[in-house]
């Protein structure tokens, strides 16, 4: 394998002594019996890669450090990370517009912040029609930020409102996380729904997609499954709007960081590797 520089567009770092991380509690959803594997501190130095691979940057996605004061997580990151990186901050999209704008102004005062993610989970069909969500996305549009989308597309029967939100906020780049959480059962009703919804979202030019999070769906995921999903995403979005990511440290449920990247790289045509593993993340997340 020739030398390859990776920019990882989806990782989480934990500081359990300073942050809250309520979701990491063993009695809090998700109720994973092996949650103890990731219930530890993780810092940038834990993103270990050996030659011929190297890590040249990353994107940190909010991890529940402090949902009420999400800037605390950004402050910690900017004090302790030395590789080029960008951060996606947590924020409650249902806040009053005045408070939402106040939070957004504080978050964007940090140089690493390029985007936001709703702190309360998936951007559901109900949330897409929430008056506060609609008005607050107009505010985000003024800032030209990224909005990360946690979407279980196989369970969403109607994404018309989501498509409308995306189409009317053209200054926002919307990035689908974890491939829209594809169902495990190919050719099931959920699988067909996932394909249909993904096809509709791909028509929006301000939408990109990250492929990762396989271990959340199946700790023993197979190569043919992930290869099929990556190939389908490239088919819909083209190689310019697809990124491959790790979801560190959750990938540790299945394998180590080095092993993960070697496995993912083997599923991608060499002609697409530079774009999917490096260039697209720099472009979409504006990593210096």
Where are these regions (language model features)?
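Active-site environment of divalent metal-dependent phosphoester hydrolases
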Residues: 14-16, 65-68, 94-96, 121, ...
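Short, electropositive alpha-helical surface patch
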Residues: 68-83, 170-176, 226-236, 260-269
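Mid-to-C-terminal alpha-helical segments outside catalytic/metal-binding sites
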Residues: 1-9, 16-49, 57, 232, ...
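Alpha-helical scaffolding within the catalytic cores
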Residues: 38-47, 72-73, 99-103, 159-162, ...
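Catalytic pocket-lining loop regions of alpha/beta-barrel enzymes
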Residues: 129-243
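Active-site gating/metal-coordination segments in enzymes
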Residues: 71-157, 208-215
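Hydrophobic faces of well-ordered beta-strands that scaffold small-molecule active sites
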Residues: 7-11, 57-61, 85-89, 114-118, ...
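Divalent metal-dependent hydrolysis catalytic cores, especially in the metallo-beta-lactamase
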Residues: 28-66, 84-92, 114-121, 145-147
């Amino acid at each position: 394998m020739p030398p390859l520089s990776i920019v990882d567009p989806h990782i989480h770092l934990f500081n359990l002594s300073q942050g809250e991380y309520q979701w990491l509690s063993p009695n809090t959803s998700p109720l994973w019996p092996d949650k103890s594997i990731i219930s530890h501190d993780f810092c940038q130095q834990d993103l270990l890669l050996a030659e011929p691979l190297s890590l040249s940057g990353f994107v940190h996605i909010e991890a529940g450090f402090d949902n009420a004061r999400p800037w605390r997580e950004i402050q910690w990151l900017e004090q302790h990370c030395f590789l080029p990186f960008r951060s996606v901050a947590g924020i409650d999209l249902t806040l009053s517009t005045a408070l939402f704008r106040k939070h957004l102004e504080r978050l964007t005062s940090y140089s690493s912040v390029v985007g936001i993610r709703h702190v309360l989970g998936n951007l559901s069909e109900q949330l897409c029609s929430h008056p506060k969500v609609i008005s607050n996305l107009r505010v985000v549009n003024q800032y030209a930020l990224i909005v990360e989308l946690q979407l279980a597309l196989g369970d969403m029967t109607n994404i018309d409102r989501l498509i409308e939100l995306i189409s009317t906020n053209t200054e926002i780049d919307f990035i689908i996380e974890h491939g829209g959480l594809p169902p495990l059962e190919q050719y099931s009703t959920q699988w067909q729904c996932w394909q249909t919804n993904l096809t509709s979202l791909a028509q929006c030019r301000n939408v990109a997609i990250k492929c990762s999070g396989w271990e959340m769906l199946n700790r023993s995921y197979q190569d043919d499954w992930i290869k099929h999903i990556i190939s389908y995403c490239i088919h819909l979005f083209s190689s310019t709007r697809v990124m491959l990511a790790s979801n560190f440290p959750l990938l540790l449920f299945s394998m180590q960081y080095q092993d993960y990247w070697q496995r993912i790289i083997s599923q991608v045509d060499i002609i697409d590797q530079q774009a999917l593993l490096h260039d697209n993340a720099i472009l979409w997340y504006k990593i210096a």
